[in-house]
Amino acid sequence: MVSQPVSAWSLVLFICCTLLTATVPALGGAGGVHYYDEFNPALKPWAPAQERNIEEVFKRYEYYGIVYSDDGAQLAVTHYLKGVVTDVSHWQRQPDGALLQEQAPNTATATVPSNLYLRLCASCHGADRLGGAGPALLPSNLGRLRKADAASVIKDGRPATQMPPFGKQLDETDVQQLVELIYSSPDADLTWDSGAINASRILLDNSHALPDKPVFTADPLNLFMVVEAGDHHVTVLDGDRLEPVHRFASRYALHGGIKYSPDGRYAYLASRDGWISKFDLYNLKVVAEVRAGINTRNVAVSGDGKTLLVGNYLPNTLVLLDAAELGLIKIIPVVDAEGTTSRVSAVYQAEPRGSFVAALKDVPEVWEIRYNAEGYPVRKIRLQQVLDDFFFDQDYRLLIGADRVQHSGQVVDLDSGTRIAELPLDGMPHLGSGITWEYRGQAVMATPNLKDSKVTVIDMQDWKVIREIPTLGPGFFMRSHENTPYAWTDVFFGPNKDAMHVFDKKTLEMVKTLRPEPGKTSAHVEFTRDGRYVLVSIWETEGALLVYDAATLEEIKRIPMNKPSGKYNVYNKIHRSAGTSH
């Protein structure tokens, strides 16, 4: 824990940040609130990540209480003292730049991991094992994973994630040391209660006085927000001119699925380390932030725009927030009737039902939370198996979930709370990235597969497989639009990761395979509001957004970006387009 007096640390950190901001004008967050975890390493004389020695990094920065993460893409805000890594991301520089304030000290700590862990694991899972781009690696999160299976994941990677294999870099002793480390208990209870949540909240003082019309000339409903994972920024993109409107520093390791208010004015961003940020798209400012958990999956916005639901891996909670100022409404512990706690896989808005839906990772239940009912009652639907990675029909009456153990899909009627069908889906279907359209007069859904080289098309009346379309490798994302005859799917994994397939929704035949940037990962398609243009990410640190004509399939423009991942069009998102995820 921090052993220095607060005033001393305040002085040290203030001097450091004053010097840095004096030399680096771009330092700091939007709206005048400066965050110590938003430095841009590209602006510093710092060796490439592969040339760094983690011990030297610790020695160099421990005096200032600052430690770089191993991959160099993020300034990890930690205080390194006496063998303990303590999160101090609560240290904030106030809008006037004159004060430091301890907003919400995090008592959650974990034993400092080995140098091996720091070198290979910390950049995704956090130096303190509390999670980042990857999940927390703690006994409470690993209860369903045997140590032998954990060793296999370390050696072989995991196809449903971006977890790479380390088998060629590690011997058996190294692997076992890492396994024992991640199953070791933290030094203190990992809690994030109402006091911590309330104390973390940050508001822009004049947010209520901001104008209620855009400060730019673009169509506000044809904007995109593009998460640039390479340097933790977000770009606001004009979908008509296909040019950036604004770029700002974000919290660390944002979840790519940005959510919007029903009118499209506000965007809500969730970081993997629990921060929820409210961004005013009209005024291009962060207007509120709160830390709702330690390791967060995602956020959902109610259909009336008044309430947010945050799903956490750590602690095992659902957190309801007031959308206006991100004030805490309620913490819902995730525990079943037998007392078994569970991580939250994801939360979803089900606007036609006036509810949120939560997918649970560790218990065979799906929870529905009524946001338009007093007290936010929770309905717990018991399932036969744990289901993950949800897809919904357009009416949100039917839920389709993946059973990762049985390698199948289940269709659950949310009205009756019963299973009505089982889908023969082998491999690892990525239902959460599925899309729907009308095929020969009836609704069908299509899903990519994270393990097998195919796209599966399913009849949504009898739930039979209509067609399996071969691809050049496992895929992650699918997209389409009401105004296009085509569906697009990537090949995210394997040697053909640079391929992008386009197939005809009427014939279910492959039309074209694009290679946007040979040798580099192409992924995550999104359409403009009218479906005229298609945006494709080159998912690399020196990447780009590639703009295609949706009719001719010809490239028309490239916009350089730093590992662009999730990108969502405001109009398509708030109108629940059948061609995009909700």
Residue ranges and their predicted role:
Residues 474-543:
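Loop/turn-rich, solvent-exposed surfaces of beta-rich toroidal or solenoidal domains
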Residues 243-248, 285-290, 327-338, 375-382, ...:
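A short beta-strand motif characteristic of beta-propeller blades
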Residues 94, 239-241, 281-284, 323-326, ...:
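Short loop/turn segments that connect beta-strands within beta-propeller blades
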Residues 295-307, 311-364, 375-378:
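Asp-box/WD-like beta-propeller blade repeats and closely related beta-sheet repeat scaffolds
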Residues 63-64, 212-213, 254-259, 296-301, ...:
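Repeated scaffold domains used in trafficking and secretory/extracellular systems
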Residues 104-111, 118-120, 164-230:
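Flexible coil segments in periplasmic/lumen-exposed cytochrome c-class electron-transfer proteins
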Residues 70-71, 219-220, 262-263, 303-304, ...:
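Residue-level detector of Asp-centered blade-edge/turn motifs that repeat once per structural unit
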Residues 123, 128-133, 137-187:
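Extracytoplasmic electron-transfer domains, predominantly the class I c-type cytochrome c fold
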